């Protein structure tokens, strides 16, 4: 028998979360962002739950080819664009929309011998300072793009840096509107946070990512309560041993946790080699939440490669084989990530290849077929 750990991808949750996005941005089309192997969920698995999107946004050509091989005939957006002139042959072959964020890409398009026009999203750097033309240079970039015969539709695009925080989007939205004033074309601005909380930025296309997978853009689980979003991944395992400790007994590498009174602990088949955060705390008043038999308890001691240890004070009847939820249904991934000093995005993407993945089909209420290992 394999180790009892597994990840479950909840297809119905993906369907639900896309519907939540549509309720928030009813007048916009939706790019469902599936970069980073669909945030660790697997492109092939996520596709089934998100196929009612208007288009898919992803990062590289390999992901785009995989999506076409699944049968998707709609729009696909390369969020970072292309990198080399030879990439344009695949952009054309697979009918991809590409982000264009620099003069070098415009020159490559100008020199390319394309059979037909390529749709682009021309990116403005309104404050993120990663990719995009400066607002003062944007109009010239747009004029350059419009003059290139190999370019068809041009959509105005930017990315918000503070849509999930107190600074908000006003400064970037003002820069975007000034840079695009009087220019024809659709617009795509909103990431997950702006999709939820800034309706005036929805425009023609929204680009939700992490909310499609049921996590919060802020990293705070409470911030998405009441939205209807559901976790699309549950990482679960079982107790594989139980230990009774006396006062003074220590737990794990470095003996960071010491029992102050008689206590029972459970050993869970899950460790950092499975993608659980090694830096998740379990000592000195800082503890990471875990569910055992559906009851909330805490991790104690350090995370090791293959195991963690949990306090069974709240579940005294737990025995070997008791179910354990590391994150997902019943325990928001953002709570675990917050305890570990990171964000839910990272935990999703860090799911290790050795963890078996089971898929709950998008049209079913019960857990479904196993599609192998996490890619």
UniProtKB/Swiss-Prot annotation:
Its EC number is 5.1.1.1. Keywords: Isomerase, Pyridoxal phosphate. Coiled coil: none annotated. The active site is at 35 (proton acceptor), 253 (proton acceptor). Pathway: Amino-acid biosynthesis; D-alanine biosynthesis; D-alanine from L-alanine: step 1/1. The modification N6-(pyridoxal phosphate)lysine is found at residue 35. It catalyses: L-alanine = D-alanine. The keyword Isomerase applies. PROSITE patterns: ALANINE_RACEMASE. Substrate binds at residues 130, 305. InterPro entries: Ala_racemase (IPR000821), Ala_racemase/Decarboxylase_C (IPR009006), Ala_racemase_C (IPR011079), Ala_racemase_N (IPR001608), Ala_racemase_pyridoxalP-BS (IPR020622), PLP-binding_barrel (IPR029066). Belongs to the alanine racemase family. This is Alanine racemase. It comes from Ralstonia nicotianae (strain ATCC BAA-1114 / GMI1000) (Ralstonia solanacearum). The gene is alr.
């Amino acid at each position: 028998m394999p180790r009892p750990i597994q990840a479950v991808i909840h297809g119905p949750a993906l369907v639900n979360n896309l519907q939540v996005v549509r309720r928030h941005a009813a007048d916009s089309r939706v790019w469902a962002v599936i970069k980073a192997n669909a945030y660790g969920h697997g492109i092939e698995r996520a596709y089934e739950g998100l196929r009612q999107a208007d288009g898919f946004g992803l990062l590289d050509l390999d992901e785009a080819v995989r999506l076409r091989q699944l049968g998707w005939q709609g729009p696909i957006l390369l969020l970072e664009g292309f990198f080399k002139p030879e990439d344009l042959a695949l952009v054309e072959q697979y009918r991809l929309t590409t982000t264009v964020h620099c003069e070098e890409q415009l020159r490559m398009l100008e020199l390319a011998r394309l059979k037909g026009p390529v749709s682009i999203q021309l990116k403005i750097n309104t404050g993120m300072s990663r990719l995009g033309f400066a607002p003062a240079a944007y109009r010239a970039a747009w004029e350059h793009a419009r003059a290139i015969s190999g370019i068809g539709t041009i959509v105005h695009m930017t990315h918000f840096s503070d849509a999930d925080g107190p600074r908000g989007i006003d400064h970037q939205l003002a820069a975007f509107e000034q840079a695009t004033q009087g220019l024809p074309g659709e617009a795509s601005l909103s990431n997950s946070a702006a999709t939820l909380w800034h309706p005036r930025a929805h425009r023609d296309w929204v680009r939700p990512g992490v909310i499609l997978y049921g996590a919060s853009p802020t990293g705070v689980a409470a911030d998405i309560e009441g939205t209807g979003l559901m976790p699309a991944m549950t990482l679960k395992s079982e107790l594989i041993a139980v230990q009774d400790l006396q006062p003074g007994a220590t737990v794990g590498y470095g003996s960071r946790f010491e029992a102050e009174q008689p206590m029972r602990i459970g050993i869970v088949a899950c460790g950092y080699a499975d993608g659980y955060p090694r830096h998740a705390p379990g000592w000195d008043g800082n503890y990471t939440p875990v569910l055992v038999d559906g009851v909330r308890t805490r991790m104690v001691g350090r995370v090791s490669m293959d195991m963690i240890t949990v306090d069974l004070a709240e579940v005294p009847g737990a025995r070997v084989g008791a179910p354990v939820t590391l994150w997902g249904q019943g325990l928001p991934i953002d709570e675990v990530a917050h305890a570990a000093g990171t964000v839910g995005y990272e935990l999703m993407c860090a799911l290790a290849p050795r963890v078996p993945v089971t898929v709950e089909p998008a049209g079913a209420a019960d857990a479904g077929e196993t599609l192998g290992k996490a890619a």
